[in-house]
A protein has these predicted regions:
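Extended, low-hydrophobicity, polar/charged segments
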Residues: 1-163
């Protein structure tokens, strides 16, 4: 089963409605945004982060136009050092290549060892956009349905106030 089909099947199983736009591969948030210009939904970026010892992993979802203050984030999650996780860690934990990170990759995290965080600024938005485990599609999903999806696959999440 391809990566998108797995996402589609799970959302349909949960009775979650969503829209999908197919487009050429998007390797940056700017490219992805250009393919869905004019459509409703907050443009997100999903960052897969880890501590220095690679003993803890984090998935942070925030507005794609907002820069991340890594020092503030590490304080809020009570970690000493945080950095972007490697492509190898991403493949190991979510079976995804770089450029396709999203909450849907958590379908592949059987260990349930990734902490999920959302920036408060986006959770009030009705619709969020993500790559559904492929950078050749963008999915539009209601925020509350995304939270329901996460809970259905065994993930809780926290909402942070990022500067």
């Amino acid at each position: 089963m391809d990566a998108y089909q797995q996402v589609k099947d799970k959302l349909e199983e949960l009775g979650i409605e969503f829209d999908v736009v197919e487009h050429p591969p998007a390797f940056t948030t700017e490219q992805a945004d250009s393919y869905i210009e004019g459509l409703e939904g907050v443009r997100t970026k999903s960052m897969f982060l880890t501590n220095k010892k690679k003993t803890q992993y984090y998935l942070l979802i925030m507005d794609d136009q907002k820069p991340l203050d890594m020092d503030d984030f590490k304080e809020q999650v009570e970690a000493n050092r945080i950095r972007m996780a490697s492509a190898d860690s991403l493949a190991e934990k979510m079976q995804l290549p770089p450029g396709t990170v999203s909450p849907f990759g958590l379908l592949n995290n059987e260990e349930k060892d990734i902490r999920v965080y959302f920036d408060k600024d986006i959770v009030s938005e009705e619709i969020m956009t993500f790559h559904p485990n492929t950078n050749e599609k963008t999915i539009f999903i209601k925020t509350q349905d995304l939270f329901r999806f996460l809970e259905s696959i065994g993930f809780s999440y926290q909402i942070l106030t990022l500067p």
